């Protein structure tokens, strides 16, 4: 896994094989950030990485100078890896070990951009539950965006906050706005 751009461009991280994750591929991540870099002034936004796994997306945000990066994952080995790696890289990432649904319900912070990469096998209803929860709480600010990474089998076009989807191999990113 490598950081694509920013202050840590080209840095590679070795991910332990025992982590229960499916990191976003470099190709997909690069395509996603090419879209986002034209929409955001990194130093002015707060980001939230839900189901953060290895922290792949969080490292990329932090390397690009995002003002606040928060990573949430339920797995203690994942959060320990993100904490250790971000410390080694000297990247400021707030790491929270929590069930994502509980965190989203209870969180009193607002974010400009939320990225979520749930396990593909959690089921379609859980994806919709997460989207609804994010848009019903204060966690996403009034001009904020949500990006969900998912398999191409899921379709969100009928959701009122859906704006578009982009496919990259077996990965799809769906974009939602308030």
PLM region spans:
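Class I S-adenosyl-L-methionine-dependent methyltransferase catalytic core
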Residues: 1-178
